[in-house]
Regions:
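Canonical P-loop GTPase G-domain recognition
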Residues: 119, 128-190
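Conserved glycine(s) of the Walker
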Residues: 21, 161, 253
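Conserved G1/Walker A P-loop phosphate-binding module
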Residues: 1-91, 235
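P-loop NTP-binding site
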Residues: 190-299
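Conserved, well-folded catalytic cores of nucleic-acid-processing
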Residues: 32, 51-55, 70, 85, ...
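Conserved C-terminal guanine-recognition region of P-loop GTPase G domains, centered on the G4
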Residues: 52-58, 77-151, 205, 222-225
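Catalytic P-loop NTPase motifs of RecA-like helicase/translocase cores
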Residues: 44, 68-69, 101-102, 130-131, ...
Length: 299
């Protein structure tokens, strides 16, 4: 595809506090659902590579877990993954929620950014909720703390001003090779994408005490003789009470979660899917390094 002798390419880290819209932004830029989205903080756990390619450029976005003060080994893993990504980029997008005051979490990230030697752009998200003077106040607050290479106000939800991000990055990135085929949009293994789809449905359906105490592992995936893709997945939680909530009265919630996840998986695989979900209790799994490794969490 790359016939442009001035083709631009490079890696761009997308960082920010939990729940500021990083994954929504990535999905909107790529035009596909790669990173799962919910209104719960710390939805993204792994660093996810998402690739945008057109005739003049290839931008490799690294969607990172939200930076927060870790409370367990999983939290430490998530923060390490986010900070590590800053060392491997040609540019950084620091995403903030324009409708929230700059806080300790933002200040922690800014301290990390001070060690970065590449251009850092402030992306002010959720401008659809702001008046002009509120937006200006938010921008000034962050500019007082760090010398950003530029400021890009956007609404990831409404896909407003996203083209400006692509334009600015094309101007910033160096001339370089096309690292990935033009039809590749992520480095995520198929099984991990499927497990994230199931986890997303749980995040959206359950109350606050459950989301970060659950993980999903795809145990088996095979094509049956009739062409149906059979997927067996286990949902791990830390308490018996969580297991009861996920299953629901007479299995109602688990059935609902399965139906919603199956619909999304079928769209991605473009085939009929039989999704077989199981729920198991693994006490304190978030503090067990071996379990985290088995579940695919990697730096």
């Amino acid at each position: 595809m790359n016939k442009n002798e001035h083709f631009k390419s490079g890696f761009v880290a997308v960082v920010g506090r939990p729940n500021v819209g990083k994954s929504t932004l990535i999905n909107a830029l790529i035009g596909d659902k790669i990173a799962i989205v919910s209104d719960k903080a710390q939805t993204t756990r792994n660093r996810i590579i998402c690739v945008y390619t057109d005739e003049s450029k290839q931008i490799v976005f690294m969607d990172t877990p939200g930076v927060h003060k870790p409370k367990h080994k999983l939290g430490e893993f998530m923060v390490d993954a986010a900070i590590e990504s800053l060392k491997e980029t040609e540019a950084v997008l620091f995403v903030v929620a324009g409708n929230e005051k700059r806080g300790p979490g933002d200040n922690f990230i800014i301290e990390q950014l001070k060690r970065v030697k590449v251009p850092v752009f402030l992306v002010v998200n959720k401008i659809d909720t702001l008046k002009k003077e509120e937006l200006l106040e938010a921008i000034v607050s962050y500019q007082d703390a760090y010398p950003f290479a530029g400021v890009i106000p956007i609404s990831a939800k409404d896909k407003e001003n996203l083209s400006e991000i692509l334009k600015v990055l094309e101007e910033t990135l160096p001339e370089g090779p096309q690292y990935f085929p033009e039809d590749m949009i992520t480095d995520q293994p198929e099984r991990l994408i499927i497990s994230d789809i199931v986890r997303e449905k749980i995040l959206l359906a359950t109350r606050d005490e459950i989301p970060h105490a659950i993980a999903v592992d795809v145990d088996e995936m095979k094509t049956r003789d009739d062409g149906t893709t059979y997927i067996r997945a286990t949902i791990y939680c830390e308490r018996d009470s969580h297991k009861g909530i996920i299953i629901g009265t007479k299995g109602a919630l688990l059935t609902q979660l399965g139906a919603e996840a199956r619909a999304d998986i079928q769209k991605r695989l473009a085939t009929k899917v039989y999704l077989d979900l199981w729920v198991k209790v693994k006490k304190d799994w978030r503090n067990k390094s071996g379990m985290l490794s088995e579940l695919g969490y990697r730096k």
